């Protein structure tokens, strides 16, 4: 049976393998194709596509866009939208996601200040040295940094005590509405998918409302299986 993975991250965001290494891993486990869907960036796609072509694997250009959803009973819920088969050279698309990254960078600067004030020395330079200059830094990177420095014992502890929603180091940042992310993906020729709904911890009725809302704006699919490694 030929298998495809439609939700994969590289070191361009919070993955552990470089784009080329992901291709090698995909070939090792027998994947026919995989989608590179890094957070708010397409920086790894060219490298992955080149390696995939040599390996005889289909590389699906993608992205995972972080959004913020509000409804009658839900306020500022972070929702992720995966885009598949996007034109990752589309200039308007690239301009939009660059703005999303700028908002994330502003959040990161505030987070670094909060950690230093709490007696956990950290700097942007140290983060870049550890994870790379071109990496989109996410809360997962801060969790790994905290583990490496001995501030916490695990990534889970970092989120449970400090980085998770409602915790001392959680900073709400500006994000687009999920419907805008769906539209943006479609404008770039892609297919929009609601990522990992099981992680949002909302009621079945609210999830149904979310899906109906996004479908009106062009949502094509819902992620039904998510594997973390």
Feature roles, as predicted:
Residues 53-208, 212:
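Extended substrate/RNA-proximal surfaces in nucleic-acid metabolism proteins
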Residues 43-52:
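Metal-dependent catalytic neighborhoods of phosphoester/phosphodiester hydrolases
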Residues 210-225:
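Structural recognition of alpha->loop->beta junctions
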Residues 23-43, 58-64, 222:
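Divalent metal-dependent hydrolysis catalytic cores, especially in the metallo-beta-lactamase
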């Amino acid at each position: 049976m030929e298998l495809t993975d439609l939700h994969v991250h590289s070191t361009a965001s919070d993955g552990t393998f470089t784009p080329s290494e992901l291709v090698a891993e995909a070939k090792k486990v027998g994947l026919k194709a995989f989608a590179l869907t890094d957070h708010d960036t397409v920086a790894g796609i060219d490298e992955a596509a080149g390696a995939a072509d040599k390996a005889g694997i289909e590389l699906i250009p993608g992205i995972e866009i972080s959004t913020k959803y509000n409804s009658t009973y839900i306020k500022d819920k972070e929702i992720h939208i995966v885009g598949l088969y996007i034109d990752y050279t589309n200039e308007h698309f690239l301009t939009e996601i660059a703005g999303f990254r700028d908002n994330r960078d502003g959040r990161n600067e505030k987070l670094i200040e909060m950690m230093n004030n709490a007696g956990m020395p950290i700097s942007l330079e140290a983060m870049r040295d550890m994870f790379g200059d071109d990496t989109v830094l996410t809360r997962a990177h801060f969790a790994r940094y905290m583990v490496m420095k001995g501030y916490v014992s695990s990534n889970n502890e970092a989120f449970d005590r400090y980085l998770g929603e409602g915790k001392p180091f959680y900073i709400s940042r500006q994000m687009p509405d999920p419907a805008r992310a769906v539209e943006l993906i479609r404008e770039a020729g892609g297919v929009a998918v609601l990522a990992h709904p099981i992680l949002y911890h909302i009621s079945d009725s609210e999830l149904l409302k979310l899906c109906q809302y996004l479908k009106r704006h062009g949502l094509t699919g819902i992620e039904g299986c998510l594997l973390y490694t």
